[in-house]
A protein has these predicted regions:
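Local sequence-structure signature of Cys/Sec-based thiol-disulfide redox active-site neighborhoods
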Residues: 1-23
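Alpha-helix C-terminal capping segments
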Residues: 21-26, 86
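Thiol-based oxidoreductase modules, predominantly thioredoxin-like and allied folds used
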Residues: 28-40
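N-terminal beta-loop-helix "entrance" segment that forms/cooperates
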Residues: 40-47
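Structural micro-motif
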Residues: 47-55
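Non-catalytic, surface beta->alpha helical segment in thiol-disulfide oxidoreductase systems
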Residues: 57-89
Length: 89
């Protein structure tokens, strides 16, 4: 499962979500963290919404990948709750 976490330096909610993702043992997660301050497009799109978690989907034999934005969970969610949500995908 390939995930993208849109974040920025000093974002404690982002850091908390990243730590929880790293604690998940039952799913193989390839996590890419993108700093929104390095891209004007990302910054404009996500500046008020981070942390944003997206699933990268590839279509069959095609090399093209698309991002599917995942539902935002409460910062108080547990690792188990996050894991349960991700298992749906």
């Amino acid at each position: 499962m390939r995930l993208i976490l849109y974040s920025k330096p000093g974002c404690h909610l982002c850091e908390g979500l990243q730590e929880k993702l790293q604690q998940i043992q039952t799913l193989k997660i390839d996590l890419e963290v993108r700093d929104i301050t390095t891209s004007e497009d990302w910054f404009q799109q996500y500046q008020y919404e981070i942390p944003v978690l997206s699933l990268v989907e590839t279509s069959g034999t095609s090399e093209e990948a698309s991002e599917v934005r995942l539902p935002r969970l409460s910062p108080r969610c547990t690792v188990a709750q996050l894991e349960k949500m991700l298992q749906k995908y």
